Amino acid sequence: MAAAKAEMQLMSPLQISDPFGSFPHSPTMDNYPKLEEMMLLSNGAPQFLGAAGAPEGSGSNSSSSSSGGGGGGGGGSNSSSSSSTFNPQADTGEQPYEHLTAESFPDISLNNEKVLVETSYPSQTTRLPPITYTGRFSLEPAPNSGNTLWPEPLFSLVSGLVSMTNPPASSSSAPSPAASSASASQSPPLSCAVPSNDSSPIYSAAPTFPTPNTDIFPEPQSQAFPGSAGTALQYPPPAYPAAKGGFQVPMIPDYLFPQQQGDLGLGTPDQKPFQGLESRTQQPSLTPLSTIKAFATQSGSQDLKALNTSYQSQLIKPSRMRKYPNRPSKTPPHERPYACPVESCDRRFSRSDELTRHIRIHTGQKPFQCRICMRNFSRSDHLTTHIRTHTGEKPFACDICGRKFARSDERKRHTKIHLRQKDKKADKSVVASSATSSLSSYPSPVATSYPSPVTTSYPSPATTSYPSPVPTSFSSPGSSTYPSPVHSGFPSPSVATTYSSVPPAFPAQVSSFPSSAVTNSFSASTGLSDMTATFSPRTIEIC
């Protein structure tokens, strides 16, 4: 009984809760079998102390020694190694251990913290609970590995977890690699933390273990890291360079996303596919409305003037001038509050949507797109009329000929053709009426023009063929007397009868008839000469 008490006094409470606290470091004590024995001893010690503490409280020493004999046999194997920690107070009494009962004894640890320790074991062959690993993991990459599939710090952490959660099954017969490496590092024994004094940690940057576990990352171990069971596996360094100060977000250009052109109103699935930069035509950049207003309101600064000049160079010039630049509008200018902000444009509008539509002329914006041919338009009505070219709809018909058109302006243009035709017909009718009136006045100038040669040609033969001793003064009354009846008598009826049968549409034939008229007149003149000869005695008598 006294031997059992002395056996229990060999180990202090701190040594029982921490078996490695007083034992000298030796390679044999670092193996798992010794750890199991010390843990079982620390868990079984409260049973011995509980059995021994009851007789001490009652003052009976014989019962405690008899009940502690069984424990002495279990702890006898360690008496030689723990003789250096013999407590000299054992001879004086057990007063230092009276406050330690079976309930509070196993809760004391090295740092006065409670630890959860199982107090009952069904058998001594039960495996140890998972040991808490308090070492540090290395995050340095392996210097001489070329494969960059997995980063090294991940595997160094995983290897430590694998070796701690899966201790080798033959711990009772053969030492594990973790225990052997702990014994070779010559570190001071302190529980299971095993901190190392040298610079190399317990688990190096490239840990090695003989039997790789295929349950964790099976594909990288079978493909990227081929090796047999006995070879060491080198793990690659991280595939990324050293960490930078700021994380740079990659900027993806907007033209790779076809629906990002919200400025053009193209956020529809019918977007035209992306074209190459070579096939694109150079168009002036779109200027927002705020920038245009800034040109009008703050044109005094030099920067805005420079921007204004560059902007004016990009303006789309109209293909033609306005037909009626000074045409009066329905609304007077002072009642149109919305003015165009462009300096070179003096247009004003009574509605804001009209101004918005007008500004698109300056900016070149075309927000309305045809879903069939992907053509863009600046106005919605232009898009509506354009769609009719695809559908074949022609709602506008001509009132005169019935021809149909898709646009109203086309019908208006076509109607002008009919108006021009009407004007031509009216002109033709006027020309025809004037022609008939002019043809009705033709006989009078012909009748008056042709007797003159007859009159001039008639007196000369009459005067020259008249052989008379009458003085020269006699011929003048003869020539002046007789032409008057000839002019009034013979030529006019002969010519009138000749031209009455001539149609007015054949002036060539009219020119051919005066010869006959002249001939007739000459024949008449011959008769007149006879008449002159007949009346000559009377004339002489008168003289």
Curated annotation (Swiss-Prot):
Function: Transcriptional regulator. Recognizes and binds to the DNA sequence 5'-GCG(T/G)GGGCG-3'(EGR-site) in the promoter region of target genes. Binds double-stranded target DNA, irrespective of the cytosine methylation status. Regulates the transcription of numerous target genes, and thereby plays an important role in regulating the response to growth factors, DNA damage, and ischemia. Plays a role in the regulation of cell survival, proliferation and cell death. Activates expression of p53/TP53 and TGFB1, and thereby helps prevent tumor formation.
Inducing stimuli: By growth factors.
Residues in C2H2-type zinc fingers: 338-362, 368-390, 396-418
Alphabetized SMART domains for the sequence: ZnF_C2H2
Tissues where the protein occurs: Detected in neutrophils (at protein level).
Domain of life: Eukaryota
GO biological process: BMP signaling pathway; cellular response to gamma radiation; cellular response to heparin; cellular response to interleukin-8; cellular response to mycophenolic acid; circadian regulation of gene expression; circadian temperature homeostasis; estrous cycle
Primary gene name: EGR1
Glycyl lysine isopeptide (Lys-Gly) (interchain with G-Cter in SUMO2) crosslink location in chain: 305
Pfam families cross-referenced by the UniProt entry: DUF3432, DUF3446, zf-C2H2
Compartments (UniProt record): Nucleus; Cytoplasm
Subunit structure: Interacts with SNAI1 and SP1 upon 12-O-tetradecanoylphorbol-13-acetate (TPA) induction.
Regions of compositional bias (Low complexity) in chain numbering: 57-66, 167-189, 429-486
Compositional bias ranges of the Basic residues kind: 413-423
Ranges of compositional bias, category Gly residues: 67-77
Annotated site location: Interaction with DNA: 336, 347, 351, 357, 375, 379, 403, 407, 413
Keywords: Activator, Biological rhythms, Cytoplasm, DNA-binding, Isopeptide bond, Metal-binding, Nucleus, Repeat, Transcription, Transcription regulation, Ubl conjugation, Zinc, Zinc-finger
Region (Disordered): 1-105, 165-213, 264-284, 318-339, 409-487
Domain notes for this protein: Binds to DNA motifs with the sequence 5'-GCG(T/G)GGGCG-3' via its C2H2-type zinc fingers. The first, most N-terminal zinc finger binds to the 3'-GCG motif, the middle zinc finger interacts with the central TGG motif, and the C-terminal zinc finger binds to the 5'-GCG motif. Binds double-stranded target DNA, irrespective of the cytosine methylation status. Has reduced affinity for target DNA where the cytosines have been oxidized to 5-hydroxymethylcytosine. Does not bind target DNA where the cytosines have been oxidized to 5-formylcytosine or 5-carboxylcytosine.
Annotated InterPro entries: EGR1_C, EGR_N, Znf_C2H2_sf, Znf_C2H2_type
Gene Ontology MF term list: DNA binding; DNA-binding transcription activator activity, RNA polymerase II-specific; DNA-binding transcription factor activity; DNA-binding transcription factor activity, RNA polymerase II-specific; double-stranded methylated DNA binding; hemi-methylated DNA-binding; histone acetyltransferase binding; promoter-specific chromatin binding
Family (UniProt): Belongs to the EGR C2H2-type zinc-finger protein family.
Gene3D superfamilies: Classic Zinc Finger
Chief location of this protein within or outside the cell: nucleus
GO cellular component annotations of the record: chromatin; cytoplasm; nucleoplasm; nucleus
Protein name (Swiss-Prot/TrEMBL): Early growth response protein 1
